[in-house]
Amino acid sequence: MTERVVLAYSGGLDTSVAIGWIAEETGAEVIAVAVDVGQGGEDLDVIRKRALACGAVEAEVADAKDEFAEEYCLPAIKANARYMDRYPLVSALSRPAIVKHLVAAAKKHDASIVAHGCTGKGNDQVRFEAGIQALGPDLKCIAPVRDYAMTRDKAIAFCEAKQLPIATTKKSPYSIDQNVFGRAIETGFLEDIWNAPIEDIFEYTSNPAEPREADEVVISFASGVPVAIDGRPVTVLQAIQQLNERAGAQGIGRIDMVEDRLVGIKSREVYEAPGAIALITAHQELENVTVERELARFKRQVEQRWGELVYDGLWFSPLKRALDGFIEEANQQVTGDIRMTLHAGTAVVTGRRSERSLYDFDLATYDTGDTFDQSKAQGFIDIFALSAKIAAKRDLV
């Protein structure tokens, strides 16, 4: 039986050329799989037909936007996930979602190899292959760009020689990856870390310096899940999409950072994630109101490790699954409403309310009606500081 390869297919030049390139290099039949995680662009059926026209023996497309939002973005919101305290894991979250469909297709079509279009220099090669090995331990992985030296110039020449039905126009100077949770821009003039980003690179966000009216929004959560915006019920996908539009119009969610890549180098990355930043900001503030102090403190440590695991491509690891359980439990009481003002590049929380709130007005107030018994404070301080006091006496001897 002829060997079969499942290819992660985008519909673009590189993966279209990869269909024939893989067939020539390996003699295998190629099955193209395109997964829609909200990246926009062409209709899925157009992409499917192009894959077949480029030589794929079969082509599958999957509308995974809701799945991506519910199963991948939502856990990140509950985890307040920001790698290096800034990056909301835009690309890292989409890779395991795509991998799940690739492995399922490989099993369905009895393929022994899964291929992707990553280079040998980035994080994504690890994310794809670590995920594939976790879900399909017997599957082999190949990357034509990395393994067969499929450069851009060679891809264009191959495309023209084979008369493939895809344009070979000049490539953008930037490397761009996008989905419903955000957009990543790198390379080109951004590789000089002194160069400021220009407005032309942004699509999800407007210039925050442009004058416009502020936008007030109320986001409602139930056990950490965004369930309504301004009182109107939403799915997780709808919440992200609506806040992408509203927060993006205010220039919220732009991130420019030098990032520690998994492969050991530092890389300059520019991100746009208006919906993600608005939702994480609101969720984190509601946690401040509803989550007990020691649980909240420990959750911050868990959040950091969770984000590192996802960034590093270990979505399917035992530790990540265990941390998921902790985060889910920590979100049980995260129910209520957060009011925010979206304006000039910032999402500012202006109001909080929750039936599960741990904020006690009578204990917190300094006005008449204060129920906090201040007479107990001195004894508490004496006990709390006792070990430090004993150590200080010793050190003075």
UniProtKB/Swiss-Prot annotation:
One of its GO terms (biological process) is urea cycle. GO terms for molecular function: argininosuccinate synthase activity; ATP binding. ATP binds at A8, Y9, S10, G11, G12, L13, D14, T15, S16, G117. PROSITE patterns: ARGININOSUCCIN_SYN_1, ARGININOSUCCIN_SYN_2. Pfam families: Arginosuc_syn_C (PF20979), Arginosuc_synth (PF00764). GO terms for cellular component: cytoplasm. The keyword ATP-binding applies. Its main location: cytoplasm. It catalyses: L-citrulline + L-aspartate + ATP = 2-(N(omega)-L-arginino)succinate + AMP + diphosphate + H(+). Pathway: Amino-acid biosynthesis; L-arginine biosynthesis; L-arginine from L-ornithine and carbamoyl phosphate: step 2/3. L-aspartate binds at T119, N123, D124. The keyword Zinc does not apply. Keywords: Amino-acid biosynthesis, Arginine biosynthesis, ATP-binding, Cytoplasm, Ligase, Nucleotide-binding. InterPro entries: Arginosuc_syn_C, Arginosuc_syn_N, Arginosuc_synth, Arginosuc_synth_CS, Arginosuc_synth_type_1_subfam, AS_cat/multimer_dom_body, Rossmann-like_a/b/a_fold. It is found in: Cytoplasm. Its EC number is 6.3.4.5. SUPFAM superfamilies: Adenine nucleotide alpha hydrolases-like (SSF52402), Argininosuccinate synthetase, C-terminal domain (SSF69864). L-citrulline binds at Y87, N123, R127, S175, E259, Y271. Belongs to the argininosuccinate synthase family. Type 1 subfamily. Homotetramer. HAMAP family: Arg_succ_synth_type1. This is Argininosuccinate synthase.
